[in-house]
Every structure is written in structure tokens, then in C-alpha cells.
């Protein structure tokens, strides 16, 4: 689909005139080491300072001519026009990205020539940095906050607000960095996690949020100062993080089209428009990264199905590539890619550097040698110290000259990284006392070296060639300005104009809607259904006074439904915030442009929804049947939607975290509802809070709709006093009776609508259009606040990486303590390996034969695994390898019995016997994702696994002692009591991986250990440490099967056996690897492959042999070759032997029943341990507990103060009823707070603990429910105290002499409400995947229950069809019990405006006239002795009011009992629904053994 264009048709003459003087290529001359073949490098080295303008112009013209000539020379293969390049129709053309013959290098040369000839070449920028020091501020306290100790941080918080950095100490991150990266060069940044690689890349690219750069630091970007480059040219230096953040519902093609269009230069070659250019660039980049086939596939994320993880990573890379930034920083961007794709990524960067002069700084973990060889320079960082910077091909020699030795088959990047690991670096004989040991010593040696002096000389040369703000800076600015849209400021970092940005974001917004139309359609259907249900409750109201309350309730419901239809936009804003901020850093668009576009994108939905909902409600309820009134109703309703949308969007944009937004939003919603004027009319609002009504947009909308409905109409009276139906009053008429409705005039049989709303609500016709104007002003103001706040307020950033401890387990010295972190000498003794002696070993052999796995994908059967054979024996370490998509993890899941769908066939045996129900518990499965409970400590996580998964017969003390053994084995002593936390504030990546392995080891798996991708995303040093650990375990007798992603040669050599899979899950090889991989390589050579060259990585060589590496090809069917080989026959023979031996030695399960139980621990112990952990999670999440407490206290106090000392008048009784009604509305907020914590625990349980048979699903559900009860009990006390006494319910009880019982029962009922809420939340979330979906489901049921509980419409006023809903609604019984307990057995005192006025018959007093009536119908007179103007109150006792609502004080305990039954139903329902929806039933799973 073509991208939209706006104001993009600037003429070619305008573009030409503006870009006539633009420098097309790299205008800088050579430094001492020239950039690698960048276009335009062949230039004079006479870079003069700014001189006369004419001389400068002549010089620039000369440069342009030279560069054009240079481009022609380097692009001689392409002689066509620009149209030939962008419209290459030849399917075999190497310039056509859709062609199988597409050649990236040929295209790049042609592109450079085309753009150069038209004076619109590529900007280039190098970097010189000198004396670079980067630091941050770290808090002295790094203990875990919990409910008990969170208050201890308050003094520090106050102090920090006064002086932000006063209570923090400076932590140096990088110290003393110097270097030059010339334009067109590539620099690889090496170092272990935490060494400062990311900080370095962020600093040089301007991503300095949370870190600070010393004032003494010198930056020079080809003459551009750092401040200007990072602000005015932000999109020219970009930082690409390792995380993949995209709109999941957007297709890959649309994602990349957007990126290409956002940075599309305006000065394009003749005949090429912006859409053609953008789509062509998108296709080229997708072809370069091998993702052309995903163009119409959704990107997806962890929850939404889309492209694979590796493809999503390449989408991230492609998006950054399309930014066309001349200076690019890539932070571990190859994470998740195998070595072949990592190499292709680096080759593409090399191509860009050579032909476009782009400069790249790249940090790579486990960099293949081939990738490293593509770089010009290397930077090695050791704990924040620069220990080498210079030519990449000289780095290895530098460290060898320092006295270190590079082992055979170790790659150069691994060798360089090993310099930062004392346990890995190898010292040459005779150099033991000469080599540096600590980071400071390495840094000092670097500063003393000859290489450093060369760097210093290069820096000085660079400074003289590119003086700050010199001619090269001017040329850069001109080139950039020529690419910008017409009218853009030079200092603006954006290519497109603001309106073009809005238009582009608008296009993307509609593409996102098209990507997930189901959500929008479902919302429209759901809202229309709610409209039908609500309308049926007030169906076909008559123009009579008896429906006044229903008519007001209908309009109130309409106002609230329209006003709060946009409440969930808060969640939407936070979900897309990281994406918007990332793309703003790329200078794609202003955040406010996306905000403005999002408002417009939502308009069609808002308009459609508003029409469907309001038309349904208006006509079904029989509101004012006047055309003008109807369209006014639609207008006000729609403006209400927009006004409140602006409010919710503003709240989201003004707060940095979702938790910051939710509590204010909850209170705001409550305040807007109460002060709208229906629940509490204006006259009844207390003075301290009257101002809220003036700021409430809902109030203005409600008043306008009430005036629209009632003004200018007369309503027939349906209730007179005295009533003609009472004997003796049948003939009463005229002035001797009056309508009992507010606004009635004695003698009239109708009530004027204006009089009613004037007296009851203080609403006036003159305010009708005034309020519309106020609403429009509020709408504009709210949206302006939203747009401005979006531009300037960013989301909260993570802190620096720091360990967090329980306060009682804090280490004696803080991490930042200089003494604690002082350098220590390298230990000279080898580590004792005897610690593995106590680790559980395996004695069983696990073997499988002819394993196949078939599954239906989009209705089509697909085979994922195809006749896979193999075994794992005790004491062996077996590698499972294969290309991406070969089914490695799938095979692991099949073998570990973790597949719940599809069809699995084949034999999977343990010592010749079929796997039983205990198999999962008796094996360990180390997953690729490191899933742990954030609030637990390392020791607690290990102990939890040990207590529940080790046999019940093992004493508890022995299990705890075994946990200590595991901690020692994994070298986790230093952080054994640290909290898991989240990345950045807790364990780092390596520590999490060790914990993941430790949790499985703590279970003492007696059979074997499955390990999935243990080194994925880790640096080579950490990967080596993880393999060290696995090797220790195998030597201790463990059987280990491990999938691994293209290991280095040295890592690969550490495995004993290999199972190698090709695409489609077909076996290529299974057998020994052999010394120096000779057994493996000999097999392939024997069957027709080339010899493995010396020094080549066998893991990479295998991929090339089978034709799986990019650019490789083979004519040999290696799967069939394996099936025909003698090695395969030997495997089959061994499998038959294992099966036969196992069957002969089989042991009856009855002899050792405990070993074969599904769960190791009994049910009671499971429940105790699991519940304790949930309690700990809640205690250590003070934000949840205090947010819940704040909500209950603030809502309770707010209601208590708003309805303070509510009188026992008719309106006072209604206010007390609404106080109870509004209290129930905290249901939604409590549910939204609770569900995310449940989802966190459930994710951990379902992904790791349930498949491992740690504890049963019944225990999981019950532990979650039990842990909520004490906290909700505490909250009920807060809510009770804050509402019961301020509102005055206690005074009603005192009047009746029932203080103790009614006070106690009121607390019990409030407690019951909160327990009902939490148990219902568990039932709702049990069947949904996300907290948002669960919250929506719960709110739908809550709204239905609230509608039909008898408050908005009494049961006798409901349509007969809905009586069943009244009876099944749990709130029917709750409201009845609470209201009757609160107000029963008290006398009513009508307010003056509630009294009905009429005259008695001639010659009688009011008392004599009404005596018979009062005896029959109730009520009382305030002036019984008067002979005129009788003042009559229709209700004397609160029990009469209760009866009208079908409530009775006598039913209070019955209703309480019914409420308890609902709670039991919730609990049983939660358990049943979880079992029904989320527990695997294995219906489709078939196995043959």
C-alpha cells in the first residue's frame, strides 16, 4: 500500500537549488589510517578553516565533482538510469530485490552512483573521543522494599526531592577512553556483561538517560560538537538496543515501509517519488537480511503469534538500517541469531561502510572469527577500563606481547574477551610475574604502550583536520538540510515536516487497525450489547412522573458509558510508549506527532461506537422524541467521549509508570461519577468539595442532557397525596391534593420538567449550550496537555545493573564501596572440584527410537520431527544442534514429555521401560527463558524446588543442606541471598542462567538433565563458565542433553556426543564428536564433503557442508546418507541392546512406590510451601499492598466525607444508598490490581513448575486465593471505618439500639464484598491469558450484576424478562443486607423541598383531613393543626424506603449466608475453570511405544 504524502511535491528545481552545494560523500581527507574504501575518501588533506564564502563554495564544488567521478569509477557495473535501479523489472536482475539473483554489493554500487550523480549522496561522520569519562549515581541502599521497611526510605525520598544527588554516591562507569573511529570504519566493542560496552555505545550515540559524561570529555563528529550532534542531528547517531520492540499487530512490510518513509530524503533522483523510493529500500533491506518472505506476516511479540524470534531480530536490524544514520551503534544485535546470520549481519554493515561511508560501532557476544575479521578497529573494555583500542588485526598481537597465550582454535574475539577473566586467560611461560592482573594494571599498560601513542597522534591529527564547527561541519549541515522537507529547520533532527510525520503516523495507525480488526469489531459488538441490555432495563419509559428517577438514571448511565468508554486508553498508551520513544530517538517523528495521529485514528471507532450505543439507548428507552433533542443528545455524548479521552490520555502521558497512573485514575473516575450531579445533587454537595463539580466534564454533559430531556415538557403525575385509591379520598381533587413529585403545584395533574430539574438538581435551560462550549474547551485543553506531555515526558527508565538483597541479608559493604571493590591478585591455585561429589548422579539410560512429531498448522498437517533416534547415558554431555527451524527445542520438549498437542509417535524409554507419570518430576529441564519469581531470593528459589521435588522421605534438613551444595557448585555464594528482581535491578543474565540450572539441580533429578540453549545471548566468557558447569555435572554422573546455537570450536569440543538435525527434524548425524572433532569431521569427509580446514570451527563447517549456511549449497542428501550409513546401523543395534537389557533388569514399581508418584510432596505440604511463597511475594510487593490500601482508604474517606452525616431525609436516604452503591465500584480497580500478580505466578507455574511436577494445579489455585484473604480482611477494616462512621450509619444503629450487632454485621458484609471480589477475580483470570482480558471479563459481569441489583431500577420497575438477573446477581443480596443494616428501624425527616403541599377540605385541619390516609398509607404531617398549606412527608420510617427496594432488615443474615455461598461458588468455579481451560487434557496426543 502506498504511503501517504503531504506537501511533498517540492519541485526538482527547488531541491536542486537547495542541494547544489551539498557534499555528497565523505568529505574528510585521510587520517593516519584511512577509512575503509568509503566513497570520497580520495581527497586533498588540506582541510582549511572557514575562509571567504566564495572560496568555500569553490572548494565544495570541487569536492562534489571529485566525488561524482569517484562514484562513477566504483560503480562501473551499473550504467543505467535511476529509474532502471528503482524499477528493475527483470526477474533475473541482480538489482531487483525480488530476484533470486539479487546482489547486495552490485545494488549498493548502483545506489551510490545514482545518488551521487544527483547530488544527494550519503552523509558521513566519524568520531574522535578523548579523556572520555562516564559516571552515574547509585543509591547507598540497595535492599528489597517490602510492606514493613518501605517507610524507612521516606526520609531519603524527601531529601532526594530537595537535593536529587545528595544521597547518592558517584559511580564511575567508564574511565579514560581515547580513540578515533573514522567515517566508513567499523569498530567492534568487546567485553563481558557489566564491563561497560553498552554504556560506551550509549554515550557516543547520545543515549545518556541515567548516565552522565564528564565535562572534560572531548567529542568531535567530523567537526560537529557532541551537544549539537545529539540534539539537532539526533537521527544521525543512533543506538540500537538488543531488545526487539515493535507494534506486534503490524506486518513486517508495513513496519519497514514506515521506517523507510520516515527517513526518506527529499532530494531524490529525477523520476523517483518518495513512495517508490521507500518501498524499494524496504524490499532491498528485507532481501539483505533474508526476511522478504515475511513481508505480510505480523511482527508479533511474546504473546501474539508472528515471525520467529530470529526473524524479529532481523526486523529490528532492518528498521535501524533504514534510518540511514551515518553513525550507528549496535548493542549485541546478533543475540538470538546463529553464527551464520550473525556473519551476514556484519557483512551487510561492512558493505554499507565501504560503499556509503557509514560508521559502525558494534558490541557482539560470541563473535565468530569470520565476523571479527570484517572490522577495522577493536575496543576491549575491562570493568570500565579501556585496555586496547586500535586496528582489529593488531589486537591479538598486542596481548600476546603483554605475555598472554592464545590457545589453539580459540577465536580472536574470544581471546580478547578472555583478558577480562582471570580464570580464562593463559599466561605464557616465564611471564607469570610480568603480566597485568587487575583492570587498573591493564589500563596502565595500555596507556604506556606504543599503540596508545599512535592513538594519541591520530586524535591530534583528527582535531586539526576537523576543527569543531569548521568547514566539514558546515558541509554536513548542508547535506542534512538538503534531505529535509521544505520548511524544516536546520536544527530539527527530523527529515519530514511535522504534518508529514502526522500523516505517516496516521497511515500506520490505520494499518494497525487493519492488522487486528477483530479487537475493534468485538468492542463495537460488546458495547452495543451493553446498550441493548441497559436499554432493556429502562425500556419504553412513559412521559410520567413515576419514571423521573429512571429517566435520570438512564441519562446518567448514558453519560458514564460515553465518558468512560476511553478509560482503557491508559493501558494502550503505556503499551506503545517504548516503541514511540525508540522511533523518536531514531528521528522518525515527534512523539507528539504520533499522539496527534492516534487521536485521529481513533475517530472512526469513536464515531461508530457513539452512534451504535447512543441510538440504541435513546430509542429503546423512549427519550425525548424530538429531532433536535436527539441530535443534541448525540452531539453532547460524542463530545463527552472526546473530553474524557483527553483526560485519560493526559493522565497516561503525565505519569512515567502505569502504577503511577492507576490510583489517580481510580479516584478521578469516582470523583467524576459522584460530582456529576445525579448521585449528589448540587445543593447537597459540601462546601469543601463543591469545586470538583466545576472541574467535572461529566457534570456539564449530564446537566445538558437533563435539560435536553426535561426542559419544555410536562409530565403526567402518577402519584398524588392523598391518593384516590385510599378509601375516603376517591372524590378529592383540585387544591385538596397534590402530586408527590418535586416541582408539583397543588391542583395540577402534571409536573413541569423545568420546575423539576430546577428544584431537584439546580439545572437551568440557559446552561444547555453554555455547557457544550465548556466541554469543547475542556476537550481542546485536555488534548493539548496530552500532546505536549507526550513530547516531553518519557517513561521511567531502568536503573543501572545492581544486586538487590533482603534488608536482613545486606552485605556488610555496598557494591560501590571502594574497599569492597578493590582489586585483588589473581588466585594461583586451581579451584577445588571436589564439590561436585555430592551432586546427584544418574544411573539410568534414556533412549528413543523413530520419534516423529506431527501437528496441524492452518489445517495442514506438518511433520516437525522425522524418525529421530538417540540416547543419553550417565556421565555424558550430548549436544543437540541444527539449523534454525530444525526442531531442536521441539525434540527436547517431546523427549521431556512437555508436548500437549499434536501427534507423537516412536519409542521413548528409560532403561527399556516406557516413561511413567513421575518422569517429568525425575528429570530436570533447564529452559532457554530464565523464568523466576522476581521477589524471591536465589536461596529461596532453590529451597522451594528442593522441598517440593525431592522425595518426601528425605529429611528437610538434608534438602536444605543440598541447596548449599548446589550454591557452592554454581559459584553463587556472593549472591545466594540476593533477590532475583528484574534485569537491571536484580540478577544479571549470567546469574539468572546459573539460577535456572540450580533450580533443576536442587530437585536432585535421578534420570537426566535437559538444557535448552544455555549460552544464547551470553558472551563467550559466560558461555565458557556455563559449559564448565555442565561438564562438572556430567563428570559427577549426570546425563545431559543440551541444545546449543553454533558454539565456538573450543566450546564445541567440550561435548562428548552430537545429535545433528536438518530442516524438518531429520537426523544428519548422531555419534561421538571425538578428539579435535575428528570422528565427526571424518564422517562427513568419508561421505563426500571437503576436508575441514585447520583452524576452522567444525560447528560452522558442518552448516556449510550440508548447505545450511548462507551462500552454501550441496547436492548430497545428508539425511538419506545417514540412514544408509554403517554408523546408523550401529546406532540401531545399540538401541535394541539398550531396550533388551532394560527390559531384563526392570524393577516393579510396587517395590518403590514413592519414586513413581506424580508429585514428590504430599498435598498438604505442597499447599503450605506454595502459600508461604505467595505470602512472601505479596509482602515484598509493597506497591500492590499499599496501592490497595490507598484505594480502600481514599475511596472510603472520599465517600464518607462527600456523604458526611447524611440526614434521614428522602434525598439523604438516597445518598446513603448511593454511598453503598459507589463503594461497590472499587471492584474494578481491585480486580485490575490483583490480576497482574496472579498472571506473574501463573506464567512461572505453567511454563516451568507444572511441567516439572513441582506441585499440583489445585495447590497453585488455592494458594493464590488463600494469600489474598488476610490482606482483604485488613482492607475491609479500613473501608468499614472510613465509610460506616462518617456517613452516619452508626447513628442509625444507635437510634434503634442495635449498635453492636449492626456495626459487626456491616464489617462482615464489607469483608464479604472484598473476599467475593478477590475470589471472582481468580475465577475470571483463570480462563484468560492476560490481566487486561481478565479485567474486561470481570468488569462485564460486574456491570451486569450492578445494573440488576435493584438500585438503578427497583425489581418492580424492571421488565419481567430481567427478573432472573435480579435474583442471580450477588449484589442484590449484598446491597440489600448492607442497606438494611445501615438504615433500618429509623425515622425519616423530609427536607423542606421534599414535602408535598396541599390544602385540606373546608372546615378541617390538616391532621383531621389526613388522619385516615396516614393510617392506611403511612407518612406524617409537619403541621397537623394548620388549616391550609398542609406539609406532608410520604415516608415516616426507613423500613418503608427499604420495602420499596425489596429489602428487609429481617433478611440480613440470610443474605449474608447467600453471599458466602457465592464466594464458595467462585472458589469452586475458579478451580473448575482452570482445569477446564488451562490444564492439558492430552486429547490430541498419541504415542506408540
Curated annotation (Swiss-Prot):
SUPFAM superfamilies: P-loop containing nucleoside triphosphate hydrolases. ABC transporter involved in zearalenone production. The gene is ZRA1. ATP binds at residues 882-889. Signal peptide: none annotated. Disruption phenotype: Results in the loss of zearalenone production. It comes from Gibberella zeae (strain ATCC MYA-4620 / CBS 123657 / FGSC 9075 / NRRL 31084 / PH-1). Residues 1-55, 811-834 are annotated as: Disordered. This is ZEB2-regulated ABC transporter 1. It comes from the Eukaryota. Gene3D superfamilies: P-loop containing nucleotide triphosphate hydrolases (3.40.50.300). Residues 819-834 have a biased composition (Polar residues).
